[in-house]
Each structure stands twice: as C-alpha cells, then as structure tokens.
A protein has these predicted regions:
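N-terminal chloroplast transit peptides
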Residues: 1-14
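Long, distal/terminal scaffolding or interaction modules
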Residues: 15-127
Length: 127
C-alpha cells in the first residue's frame, strides 16, 4: 500500500483576540476562496469589507458564516441548515454570489484583486 500524500503544512498566523478574531478568520477565508475559485473581489473595496464584516458577525453570533445579504425569518435555523453559509450553494454550484464578494472575471463589477488585508476590511467597514 502506497503511503498517503502528505498535505502541505500551513503556517498559522497568530489570530487577534476578541472581536478581531472572527474578522481575521473570515478575511483569510475570503482571500483563500477567491484564489481557489478563480473569482475576484468587487472593484469597490467597501462592498467586500462590509460583506466580510457581516460574515464575521454571523460567525461570532451564530457559529457559522451565514450570508449577511439576505433576510431570514430565523437566522439560527438557516445557519444550521447551511445552504446560505458562505460559500453558499449557489456560489459553489454556479459561481453566483448574491453579496458580490466573489465575482467571476467577466462580471462588470469585478476588480483585479483576489486579496484584501484585515486593515483594509476594518478601514472600509468603519470598524
């Protein structure tokens, strides 16, 4: 039996404490997922920042990064179902992001960046 391939080791950054922890996690997730999915962030950084902030808030309060751009009768129930947890099913299946967080290269609002810094998220989301 051949040995299992080893996964590359990922250097973990020291995460900030308190409120910034979920924001740092969701920022890192966004940067990684944009690259993996070959999508781009909105050309207007405040759109990206506000969505990441909403995802971080939901992660902190609900335990899951529930899409912040939709209305829910019961957020806790929706978070448990997982359909609208980021990346949501429409994004995973069809590359359709209602929040404009992950945009295909041909989208008129897509910027050139697949990365945003934690500092820029804070700056553009008025934290």
């Amino acid at each position: 039996m051949a040995p299992r391939a080893l996964r590359p080791k990922i250097a973990l950054q020291m995460l900030p404490e308190g409120d910034d922890k979920d924001l740092a996690i969701m920022t890192a997730f966004t940067n990684r997922y944009a690259k993996v999915s070959n999508t781009f962030m909105c050309s207007e950084p405040s759109v990206t920042a506000v969505v990441i902030k909403g995802l971080a808030d939901h992660r902190a309060t609900l335990g899951a990064p529930l899409c912040p751009c939709r209305f829910y009768e019961d957020k806790e129930a929706e978070a448990k179902v997982g359909y609208w947890n980021c990346p949501c099913v429409p994004m995973r299946e069809r590359h359709e992001c209602h929040c404009m967080l992950f945009l295909t290269p041909d989208n008129e609002f897509a910027g050139e960046s697949q990365e945003i810094s934690l500092e820029d998220v804070k700056k553009h989301s008025n934290i």
